[in-house]
Amino acid sequence: MSFLEEHYGIRRNLILDRLEFMPYTPSADAGKGYRPMRGKDYNTMFVDLQMAGVSCYQNFLRAVIDSNYAKEFNPYTDYLYALPPWDGTDYIAQLADTLTTENRELWQKGFKRWIVGLVACALSDEDMNQLVIILYSEQGKGKSSWIRRLLPPEWKEYFYNGIIDPSNKDDARLLATRIIINMEEFEGVKPGELAALKRIIAQDNVTQRKAYDIEAFTLPRHCSFIASTNNRQCLQDIGGNRRFLPITITGIDYH
């Protein structure tokens, strides 16, 4: 145990439900930060132990690492709680104003509600963000780039771009392992598909079973949905539903 503590940082990512490690000793991989544990990484640790004269079985090493020995890590709380105290500036309004829209008041109120819901959903296992913003403009305005920039670099891995299929197990898992799902090139939904989309937006957890686990486990939903489209018609198709906020963009300021 002392050898591992001296040479490696080992943690369990609570959002991605995976083990991650970082070597402390000088090597080609040192300084790259934490990364997922792969089979070769277990093997490397085992070889390091043997070369250091520490005798143990390889399955015991795996058991130690994949246990409560690994400290818990939440990327959302780790980042947010390290930020400086709020200075009173309305940064949400400033961020919202980087988009010029046809109805500024509606956009300001809607975006504040959505971004506050995003943070609450990320931090809490109980809160859900059931509002979906749909950004419309002509092609080439940079909607997807603007959406990506909503997240800090530390959360890059927790962004998903694309339409999800709730019947697909891997897609359903994204509800728990991503903070933003951007339904890029959203073309609206057929009348029969709207109910299914609303169920996804309101879903509060994902229940699955890994191949090597004994029982199924439940992961809380942490994602918020946003969509971008070049099709004005889809705004009319989805309009009138309280879960969706269609916004027409006339300009984007990246500065």
Give the ranges of each region predicted by the language model.
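Short glycine-/polar-rich loops that comprise or flank the Walker A/P-loop
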Residues: T177-I179, D204, R221-S224, G239-L245
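Conserved catalytic/switch belt of AAA+ P-loop NTPases
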Residues: L194-F217
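AAA+/SF3 P-loop NTPase mechanochemical coupling elements
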Residues: D170-A176, K210-S228
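Conserved AAA+/SF3 P-loop NTPase catalytic/coupling segment centered on the Walker-B
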Residues: I179-A202, L235-N241
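P-loop NTPase catalytic core of nucleic-acid-dependent motor ATPases
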Residues: S67-A176
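Short, polar loop motifs at secondary-structure junctions
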Residues: N230-Q233
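A short helix-turn-beta junction within AAA+ P-loop NTPase domains corresponding to the substrate/partner-engaging
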Residues: L235-Y254
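N-terminal nucleic-acid engagement/recognition segments and initiation subdomains in replication
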Residues: M1-Y91, E102-E105, K109
